[in-house]
């Protein structure tokens, strides 16, 4: 069995909770023979609270549900037009520490945005990726049994106004941005394959397979 191979699932537009549950079940059931996976998904509008999330950072959720998550970090928003990439990796197999994985995911986004002539950077004091002072990508992980789950959320072509109902990632007044501000044609469909390709490159080009859409 080719343990190094990574399977890539394209889940389309999905509610948050069933995907989160599936991710937990996958991680709990893993053993040393389980192949790593990358899940690409867009979510219906939802606020997710991180494990250390404080209720005061949810200002006026209104009609958007607030769901507790066990990832790191504070509250964020997911919605259509944002590409979420969940990384279900055996860190020992990949010879990665948690901090290295965070850096690798941030660099994946920086490299992807550079292909679209968008200059971006991570910040030491606030995980994620930024264009100037504005946040374009949120990041939150959980490690269980030496395996990662959760991942990143890149704003591409979405309605950003729900971010005004929260303090994104616990920072009051944090301004958000998205790829469409610089690249009007950008879409999750076109950006997702570039994200995956850049992540695989940083993982030293392991064999991979896109699974057929369900």
From Swiss-Prot:
Pfam families: LplA-B_cat (PF21948). Keywords: Acyltransferase, Cytoplasm, Transferase. The active site is at residue 169. It is found in: Cytoplasm. The record marks 135 as: Lowers pKa of active site Cys. Catalyzes the transfer of endogenously produced octanoic acid from octanoyl-acyl-carrier-protein onto the lipoyl domains of lipoate-dependent enzymes. Lipoyl-ACP can also act as a substrate although octanoyl-ACP is likely to be the physiological substrate. This is Octanoyltransferase. The lineage of its organism: Bacteria, Pseudomonadati, Pseudomonadota, Gammaproteobacteria, Enterobacterales.
